[in-house]
């Protein structure tokens, strides 16, 4: 009977360790995914800012060409 208890405790302990390792890996994967999404958002925002400056640049160039 004591052997069965020890075996059962060992199995439960190893199961919990395995579960915690899987949860940790899952958490790390989610963090990497969130960081990647944040980087992508920042890149899109930079592109939008640059595209928003195009009309201003065209306006400045046309003003300069009228003067010169």
Curated annotation (Swiss-Prot):
GO terms for cellular component: extracellular region. Residues 31-41 have a biased composition (Acidic residues). InterPro entries: Frog_antimicrobial_propeptide. The keyword Signal applies. The modification Leucine amide is found at residue 67. GO terms for biological process: defense response to bacterium; defense response to fungus; innate immune response; killing of cells of another organism. Residues 1-22 form the signal peptide. The keyword Secreted applies. Expressed by the skin glands. Residues 25-47 are annotated as: Disordered. It is found in: Secreted. Residues 23-48 form a propeptide. Keywords: Amidation, Amphibian defense peptide, Antibiotic, Antimicrobial, Cleavage on pair of basic residues, Fungicide, Immunity, Innate immunity, Secreted, Signal. Antimicrobial peptide with activity against Gram-positive bacteria (S.aureus, MIC=32 mg/L) and fungi (C.albicans, MIC=64 mg/L). Shows weak hemolytic activity. Belongs to the frog skin active peptide (FSAP) family. Medusin subfamily. This is Medusin-DA1. It comes from Agalychnis dacnicolor.
């Amino acid at each position: 009977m004591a052997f069965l208890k020890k075996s059962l405790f060992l199995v439960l302990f190893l199961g919990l360790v395995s579960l915690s390792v899987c949860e940790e890996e899952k958490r790390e994967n989610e963090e990497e995914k969130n960081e990647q999404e944040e980087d992508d958002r920042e890149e899109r925002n930079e592109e939008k800012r640059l595209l928003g400056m195009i009309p201003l640049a065209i306006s400045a160039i046309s003003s300069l060409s009228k003067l010169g």
